[in-house]
Amino acid sequence: MKPYYVTTAIAYPNAAPHVGHAYEYIATDAIARFKRLDGYDVRFLTGTDEHGLKVAQAAAAAGVPTAALARRNSDVFQRMQEALNISFDRFIRTTDADHHEASKELWRRMSAAGDIYLDNYSGWYSVRDERFFVESETQLVDGTRLTVETGTPVTWTEEQTYFFRLSAYTDKLLAHYHANPDFIAPETRRNEVISFVSGGLDDLSISRTSFDWGVQVPEHPDHVMYVWVDALTNYLTGAGFPDTDSELFRRYWPADLHMIGKDIIRFHAVYWPAFLMSAGIELPRRIFAHGFLHNRGEKMSKSVGNIVDPVALAEALGVDQVRYFLLREVPFGQDGSYSDEAIVTRINTDLANELGNLAQRSLSMVAKNLDGRVPNPGEFADADAALLATADGLLERVRGHFDAQAMHLALEAIWLMLGDANKYFSVQQPWVLRKSESEADQARFRTTLYVTCEVVRIAALLIQPVMPESAGKILDLLGQAPNQRSFAAVGVRLTPGTALPPPTGVFPRYQPPQPPEGK
């Protein structure tokens, strides 16, 4: 099996997770599941970034030890991922012992390359962004200095720190971007990065002495690594680094895909490849920066009180329903918006009507009229062959969309086919054919139900990465054994005569809770 290594960004556990975190995890999980079903040996890494000033300050404000807050909040992130059915292979925490060793080895390699030196740093620092800013990237607003880009407050910092010779990598980075046009996606982010790097790069401060919550610099324990040096290294740690001779590292590095938010593209597409070039380590193959998820078009924030809790949402509406909505509603890579009305519409229109109702109606007819067994079809008419051909061609189209991280287009293609299937079912009128005493009509009845069940099967196979539990239930209803559920089974038709279990509904319509009478 061909290996495939995919990662999410690791989240800061300084506050509770929100639906924006869930969006990235669900998208990456869908890709990991797709690759597994498509015959790949997948390694899927996610986790939390427990170091940095942001976490230390949150702990101080809460009056708890930093390690305790980081551990407690990381547990919340891990439980959220488990609640959303995220199929990670490792949930890494940057406090893990093997991660400290990996970070120190990366530092040693960059130092041995002559790319690290000691100097004095003075400039503006944003704790919230864990990022340095030059004067021209800030502005005074009502007496407070804020970053122009993110609007977060900055403080003036002066200390002796180690620097990384980022300036030496300007041309090498640009050469890599041009030689590997798919390295950064989508195109808008790629253009942003190329524009930024083309302007020339300054050396980067990569250690701090003003606090001690982080990975200690080798041979210089009074310095801790700048949180992004340590954080980015997690992708190497997850592949077994620094043991580059290990089976894990040789099999999975370089990473095939880093899935991140657009706000951290500079760290991943500029700093990270420069660190790896310095250390003599192969670069990841692709970095995809997705957009932000807003609430009714507004940025989610605690101060506004419009943050959506993904676990509460899943408990109210269903895990698979939330997973489907987030990947279907928003063109992946662009900003998108959440609203209660939009998700209920998707549940009732796409899931309950288009897929759930089609499966329920066809399987109920099979149970009632054909002894609960897959019907034996007659000769396929043009309408049958056309619908089957559309369904048969879906895997290649869906694969292409997943490889481009365009899950919304993959789902759109599947639902277009389901729209065709519903029209086909209405035109063929199996409920009329069933009552006919004509043998030809009975053959059409069996053929119509066979074709409908077959295209529902193909749809269920292909939606497994997005809705694993619900797709599994549909495949159960179609009598598909566990070894008939990989994408290799797409072209293997339903076997006539297969006994099917009694049909049950998979996607109930969502009815909002009614207030008690008299209220």
From Swiss-Prot:
Record Gene3D superfamilies: 2.170.220.10, HUPs, Isoleucyl-tRNA Synthetase, Domain 1
Domain of life: Bacteria
Region Disordered, residue ranges: 500-519
Catalysed reactions, as listed in the record: tRNA(Met) + L-methionine + ATP = L-methionyl-tRNA(Met) + AMP + diphosphate
Binding site for ATP: 302
E.C. designation(s): 6.1.1.10
Name listed for the protein in its UniProt record: Methionine--tRNA ligase
Enzyme class: ligase
